[in-house]
Amino acid sequence: MRGAMLALLTFALSLATFIEVLDSTVTNVAVPSIAGSLAVSNSQATWVISSYSVAAAIAVPLTGWLSQRIGEARLFVWSVLLFTLTSLLCGMAGNLELLVVCRAMQGLCSGPMVPLSQAILLRAFPPERRVLALALWAMTVLLAPIFGPVLGGWIIDQFSWPWIFFINLPIGLFAFAACAALLRREPPDPHQPPMDVMGIVLLVVGVGALQGVLDLGRDHGWFDSSLIVGLSLIAALALVSLLIWESAEPYPVIDLSLFRDRTFSFGVAIISLGMVSFSVIGVIFPLWLQTVMGYTAFQAGLTVAPLGILALVFSMLVGMFLDRFDARVVTSFGFLVFFAVLSWDAHFTLTMSFWQIVTPTFIQGIGLPCFFIPLSAAILSRVPNEKLAAASGLSNFLRTLSAAFGTALSVTWWDNRAAHHYGNIAQSEIGRAHV
């Protein structure tokens, strides 16, 4: 595939990836609106987010196994179509219970979309242009979480919460039609390996319980809650059992042999740590703007959005010129930029203007593509073509799980520090009153 057809396929794959990643963040600002419309509490409305994240977390690592049984192109096309249809159902839901069920269905459909879009793009481009393909893919993965809160806030202000789901319909249908027309669907292998039933059960139970801990832990006081303790024990037992089972299973649902490649293992470890850091600043910064500086969700989103400008530009530059530089140098440069911006952010004060806050955020857009694109290229650089879908699914699962860890830990840390400082202020005021 070349020329206009390759460009159209790249555009369609990018759109599908964009709406999937966007949908995982756009609902964050819609919780109060959903709660008010459906007459439930804010904590109950957060199940709209949790149900999606749990279902997606279960589906992502199954991508490689499903691709073997169904075919990559067929699985991707059907995932896009079902994701679009479940978006329609989410927007039409008239009560919280139905909305949560539809969001869980949407999460299951979304799981294969991001890893398969990466694998299909890499296979469509010639080897010498794979870094450019990864740069195009990384742009959508990096930019969607940045613009999600802005778009979500604007849609809710101008229309109503169902439209954050309805907006997926034209985009999803176009991506489905284009991919269905352009992707060659190979017939499934008639000699299917036996189904790893035990592996699937352990994966679903372990990942579901772990994601439940991350989503519900803060609201239940973490390990002060018997629910969280129980879920943690279930997750630990199931995931340890999964590792033991899969290491001996001849036809595993998760291919642990990928970790024998040091490049894959090291790249996944570094990018996972990077996602923890990125998610921390991505959560704490808007939280500080809204709870301390008095910004609305939309204003906070506008403050973060400039990050996407330089990220877009440098994604293309890294994709075009990475082969002329040592990838380790580019990655280190991206990390140093990110570290410098974090140090800058640490000195923010309550008297800073909008533009003083935006400037370091804008500069941060240089570091993100320089860090993530070379690592994404390295992770898959030595993976055989027949294992690309499995490797992409596994690396994306660990990346997403790391972001969930970072989000849960950062919000808990924020709440604890806020309670500590508010307590000090209260004690100070009491002391003054007695004087």
Go through the PLM ranges and name each one.
Residues V60-G199:
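Helix-loop-helix hairpins in multi-pass membrane proteins, especially solute transporters
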Residues Q44, R129-L136, K387-L394:
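Cytoplasmic loop-to-transmembrane helix junctions
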Residues P115, L136, V141, P145-G153, ...:
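Glycine/proline-centered helix-kink
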Residues A177-V197, I244-V253, L350, N416, ...:
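Helix-loop junctions on the cytosolic side of multi-pass membrane transporters
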Residues P170-P188, V204-L216, I234-A248:
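C-terminal membrane-cytosol helix-exit motif in multi-pass small-molecule transporters
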Residues Q44, F174, R399-H434:
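Hydrophobic transmembrane architecture of multi-pass small-molecule transporters
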Residues L6-G64, L98, S160, M198-G199, ...:
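Transmembrane core module of solute transporters
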